[in-house]
């Protein structure tokens, strides 16, 4: 009985198959990550509010260009937690909290969060949760942006002319790819350097 | 730093709706939301909005009090209405022609309908928010609706930290100013400083998250079946609220169907 | 877990067999070859240098260690003969951060959380919650919001949450490190009462030995390599290991590290016997060194508040004041504003070159708020803060009107939490940030720094000097967030010093620090005093006040 502690840390759940089961630390970090994304999004909308409302009055689809800010929780959650469902859980919870902080969205945030989280989740599912590189992140962000446009066009923008809906979709996809995709990958890398991800799948350093 | 204080995510709770069970309120709000989201015509949405206002006035939240507290919601609804009026291809006589902006009677009607709908969608969310305790809501979600307890409780614990994060945000602003950060000029400088501040908040919050996970795990969280110290209870108030909500949802549909105006969003 | 009806001695035995821990990516193991047993009911104080793996050991005993790749541990740990992870509810664990030991938003729910997880039947939960709250002397309604608690109360709440689970082994990881003196004593008393009454086995990690000495009966001291250096009865071990402990920076009872006193050139009037209110604006009787004792910053009739006017109102105030100042008119003083709810009022003080001023007072007396107001980071609720020309050096005489660049070269503020002030990805860049900022400004405008604009070479030399003096040279390329607590504290002070401000304002600089970091900080501050820098420290630390020969301003009396 010299080496009994060779199992994974965390919960009793964490002891069996490691890759795909959620430990307590994964769940709690995912939830807090969603919360902090919501707070940052709220600050970001406060900062951009004059700009965004002015541009929304001048040319509504331009709002799609900053839509990526709304989607960061999904990709960041997937990149950090690296568990099936992480994107969906983070994006849904963040959307609900963003809805609470901003209050002008109503319960449709639940639908929005599900649709957008699903977009990210699908991309990582296609890699079977094995690839978390810059490309995957960017594609995930873009798909999430596209899903956002589809959802918004259906739920809110249905009166818009079709070409305007398309412009909006292009804008949100771009914004998703850049802000929620590529940028979040760099954020994940910067977070790895700080050591705060040490307990998570994304932060585990290699053994020498 | 400024007086940007934490928004009252969950305001003071009193009155009939506050005593109703959160799950009933949530499901009711979702039902009304669903009816409005799927319906594009102003009659359905107008009746739904009116019904909600009557219900809220009945429990002591008059339209004036709502307006003074919720003007950003009204503003957002107006902005989205304007956007639609601009971009709708509904025809009719031209009312305004300004550069690329063309507004016709048809598009103005569409815009007005969107603004009305925006208000009607926002209201159920706000109502639940103003009258519900998050802990009670979590109890209901896990015990009544059977959502996974580990995720619901982690979300509840994370929600408590939102307030801590908002306070920390303003401390961070001062702490970084003391180092001379944010010296960059123009919008780019503002963005860079925002990014830096957000990153530090992210680091702090993730640190907190791993410590919180440790605390929760040490208290036996996630180890197996658990009991609940609080039980959600359902009473006469809930029946009343349920009936009112169904009446609003069904009434809105019934009126617009009777008038022949009902239209789904895909129609 | 079936609840035990019998509250008789219930401690469990703890066994460690050749236990070690090596985090992936680290050069050295945190713990090596620890073999010992702890008898049921034994109370142990675990000491050692920071980074020696004390926390890791406690986490392993609690079964909550966060092992990144599942291969960090070696050897064997048992609690009551089984793996700690199979002994949920047997072990109670507390760490030092109050904010993350509160889980739920109501006091009662928070204490009940652990009982729910142990599947205690509902009818037993609430009596046990009340009993646990009584036990830690926290008489609050069950609905009381947890956000309204002080740090010390939060820690006692956490203890109640742990004790309600009726643990048979209590593990405490620096439970009082983030709590003020009174809070620490109350917590300690609550722990002592609980473990003695139930005969619970206890292991506590804490570098404030005096606090726990009366409670524990055995002391284990780890060395730098994570091995057991001393192990034995409290008195004997503390005596035998005293030298090693002092070297490691443990606060052994009756000892304060010796530091050099400030030179105090310039016989200014500031002394411990004079109140700052006594010399309102009186000119300083000539000091022997030019500048020493000279007033750099003063406050008159000052009231301070955390509640600030809206951002736009502050910007308007700033524009108006700057316009008045450019036209040579007096700066407007802040009028009484009831909306701002001052936490402290009627403050008169002078901050003098080469002198230290300690701001003391009970929690909530407005000490930190005063510090931030003096630093120009908050606007006064009433009265004024004025910078003398020697400090303002061409800028407006009110610090709250300075922009970030003007601020760093004049007033350096060290916040209580070092990580809040980190801006760059490496230690070196962090230190270079301030000077670079100044140089960029100097290139842009005519803003002056003390003794003209430093050249790049001067900056590099200053950064190198700071790295060496603060023992951070080996870590120059490390990410600031990865440093230990003491290293972060030293870095946060160094980053501010890198911009060579004439006034240094520190919020609880020595709080929770080990004796080694404490001595280094004091040496650094004394050196700054000797250079003619004015030091303002918000502190509870009597030893610090004595070491800096600081004048004391007591708030809230």
Q: PLM ranges: what are they?
A:
Chain C
Residues 123-141, 299-302, 445-475:
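Conserved ABC ATPase "signature" region
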Residues 145-149, 153, 479-483:
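Conserved ABC ATPase signature
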Residues 159, 187, 493:
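Hydrophobic anchor residue at the start of the ABC signature
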Residues 226-249, 546, 556-557:
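Conserved beta-strand-loop-alpha-helix hinge in the C-terminal portion
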